[in-house]
UniProtKB/Swiss-Prot annotation:
<dbReference type="GO" id="GO:0004519">
    <property type="term" value="F:endonuclease activity"/>
</dbReference>
<dbReference type="GO" id="GO:0046872">
    <property type="term" value="F:metal ion binding"/>
</dbReference>
<keyword id="KW-1133">Transmembrane helix</keyword>
<feature type="active site">
    <location>
        <position position="116"/>
    </location>
</feature>
<dbReference type="GO" id="GO:0016020">
    <property type="term" value="C:membrane"/>
</dbReference>
<keyword id="KW-0479">Metal-binding</keyword>
<keyword id="KW-0472">Membrane</keyword>
<feature type="transmembrane region" description="Helical">
    <location>
        <begin position="20"/>
        <end position="37"/>
    </location>
</feature>
<dbReference type="GO" id="GO:0005739">
    <property type="term" value="C:mitochondrion"/>
</dbReference>
<keyword id="KW-0812">Transmembrane</keyword>
<dbReference type="InterPro" id="IPR016071">
    <property type="entry name" value="Staphylococal_nuclease_OB-fold"/>
</dbReference>
<feature type="domain" description="TNase-like">
    <location>
        <begin position="59"/>
        <end position="217"/>
    </location>
</feature>
<comment type="similarity">
    <text>Belongs to the LCL3 family.</text>
</comment>
<keyword id="KW-0255">Endonuclease</keyword>
<feature type="active site">
    <location>
        <position position="156"/>
    </location>
</feature>
<feature type="binding site">
    <location>
        <position position="113"/>
    </location>
    <ligand>
        <name>Ca(2+)</name>
    </ligand>
</feature>
<keyword id="KW-0540">Nuclease</keyword>
Length: 235
């Protein structure tokens, strides 16, 4: 029996431009879907979900402030994709503390140190309550964007926090320093400023000249770092 002649015009090689184009399209779609899922679908629940890549890329995270615990830190419920992914209308943010357990990141504001509150029977610094009240009113129960830099020894995510106000997006650390309710972070290790260190120092100098907040204390003013060294030595 004679062999059936092959029609070379119907053969398609794996290296055919159409095959290569289709393969490239499938690969690109899969990659973009993966990146979209990572950035806009996957929730980061605790510091254990923060990868080195997220820190290296300073990947912006959008979420809701569930609680302000101190003058320079707060609890953050990650809501990837925001309202476009249903947060706030289709997907509810828990309000019960038990429901929020292991579901939030502790954010430590970068570049700023607020006056120390009373802990373990130790005295509170002047303006510590004012700083807490200010931060609570500024970001509490609001959506913010955080830019992560590192994780500190207390498992907090050190980050820049930004919140929308009527006058635009505000850097929370900068606004706290502007009000004299925090000073530029003075620790020699673990300091994170992003690209705003010069701005923070200029705002601090202005608040000091205007005697705002802690700077109204004059020579009685003690920095949070000095206060901790004096009252928490050996703890």
């Amino acid at each position: 029996m004679a062999p059936i002649p092959q029609n070379s015009s119907t053969e398609v090689s794996l290296l055919h431009p159409k095959v290569l184009l289709l393969s490239a399209g499938i690969t690109t779609t899969a990659f973009l879907s993966y990146k979209f899922h990572q950035r806009y679908v996957t929730r980061l629940r605790t510091y254990l979900d923060i990868t080195p890549k997220i820190l290296d890329n300073q990947q912006k995270l959008y979420g809701y402030v569930t609680r302000v615990g101190d003058g320079d830190n707060f609890r953050f419920f990650h809501t990837p994709g925001g309202v476009f992914m249903g947060w706030g209308w289709l997907r509810k943010i828990p309000t019960n503390r038990n429901q929020l357990k292991d579901e939030t990141l502790m954010i430590r504001l970068c570049g700023v140190d607020a006056p120390e509150r009373s802990h373990w029977g130790k005295p509170a610094q002047p303006f510590s309550e004012e700083a807490l009240i200010w931060l609570s009113s500024y970001v509490g129960k609001r959506y913010v964007t955080v830019t992560p830099f590192s994780i500190d020894q207390y498992k907090r995510l050190v980050a820049r926090a930004q919140v929308w106000k009527w006058t635009g997006k505000k850097d929370v650390s900068a606004e706290m320093i502007r009000q004299g309710l925090g000073i530029v972070y003075e620790g020699k290790s673990g300091a994170e400023f992003g690209d705003n260190e010069a701005l923070y120092r200029n705002l601090e100098a202005k608040a000091k000249r205007q005697k705002k907040g802690v700077w109204s204390l004059g020579k009685k003013m003690t920095t949070p770092g000095e206060f901790k060294r004096e009252h928490y030595r050996g703890d």
